[in-house]
Amino acid sequence: KIEVESENNLYFYLFQYSPDLTNTKGDNKNFVRLFPNQLDANNYFKKGSYKIPSNNKYDLLLTLEANEISTNELIVALALRKEVSFKQAMTFANFNKILSGIKLVDRREAHIPYSVNKR
């Protein structure tokens, strides 16, 4: 579970960034929206504490491709003053284009690196 502590009302988004999916043209959709999703759609948080998932209908799992031994990825958490429509999967360029259109005073972001290793 991921815990979010909010001091203000905000719209919260959670993404997984997998740089290994990027090809030389940057065409691959390596940003995947984890939250909000079909099972947990309410991403408007008032001041307070929240957990994702907010219910026990799903888990956030880390996996490797069949041919991978390990990978380094990133969780990107965004807190925004206004709601933004993010697609389920985006290229690095598309994600950054949307993000650059949001003023710094209207967003907070956290980047959480992690590794997944085969046992």
Placement of each model-derived feature along the sequence:
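Secretory-pathway glycoprotein ectodomains that are cysteine- and/or Ser/Thr/Pro-rich
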Residues: K1-R119
